[in-house]
Amino acid sequence: MEKVRLGRTELIVGKNSFGALPIQRISKEEAAKLLRKAYDNGFNYFDTARMYTDSEEKMGYALADIRDKIIISTKTAATTVEGFWKDLATSLEMLKTDYIDIYQFHNPSFCPKLGDGSGLYEAMLEAKEQGKIRHIGITNHRLAVAEEAVKSGLYETLQFPFSYLASEKDIALVKLCEEHDVGFICMKALSGGLITHSDVAYAYLAQFPVAPIWGIQRENELDEFLSYNDNPPSMNEERAAFIEKERLELMGEFCRGCGYCMPCPMGIQINTCARMSLLLRRSPTAGHLSEKGQAMMAKIDDCINCGKCKAACPYGLDTPNLLKRNYEDYKTFLK
């Protein structure tokens, strides 16, 4: 498996790393089977979060006996010092470990710093001094916050969305991390399911000093990435042309499915409904036109234009308008 150095952490992780958000949706035994198969076939880095319901618990169940052979990162979305320590204690308990390799602030709206009044970064330092965490990281979807974190010198890793749909500013962020020796952990490498050719995604990311974490829920998905261990895809003219075609279709105002607009006070499944037009055209067999799918989309009519989703969107999308456009397009598929 190809490897990458995570900046000044000096941790060496595989270009195939495990994103454990999707294992929330499967049983403990199914998750354990996937996690162990990944480890047995060369995965050494596993990423989760306190917000991912029982993901940490499943990871601890599956990997506790090989703890010293793997790298674990998790996250806290706490906004208070009390919440920080509560999250950390719970994560350590669920993961069945006494330390976390990389502890990350989970998509904060600002860049926590020393002396900012929140006490959050001071708590990180204290946790590190106590040996409960080894490296300090941050995850974000906002370019300005990410850039500030990298330039601050306070963070050893940055986790940020990066795929072959990346803008020039996103690519510049990768270079900024390299200049500051900050490890770049790449999330949303398949753009929330909109990218369906993982070989092209892998080949594109292999050009950069980034560590992709692939969200894996099914064994066939894992097998697909494992096939790249011995035969890693690389960029060629055909893949470059395919990426250019994809960029023309997917660049611009589209929902990435990050879910930071959720929950909706009216019960609208925003992070699915707001990108339904693309899902219908890119995964037509996924049952989007079922009775359940139609009922989900019909909830868009209940939108009261409160603006909460628009204010929360890290990509600055006009979410209410995007929902309405997607619903109008959806109706054309029902005729």
Residue ranges and their predicted role:
Residues 44-49, 73-74, 134-137, 157-160, ...:
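Short catalytic-loop micro-motif centered on adjacent basic/acidic residues
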Residues 29, 79-185, 190-193:
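Glycine/proline-rich, positively charged
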Residues 69-72, 155-163, 233-239:
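Short hydrophobic/aromatic-enriched beta-strand-loop microsegments
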Residues 19, 49, 103-106, 139, ...:
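Conserved residues at the C-terminal ends of beta-strands
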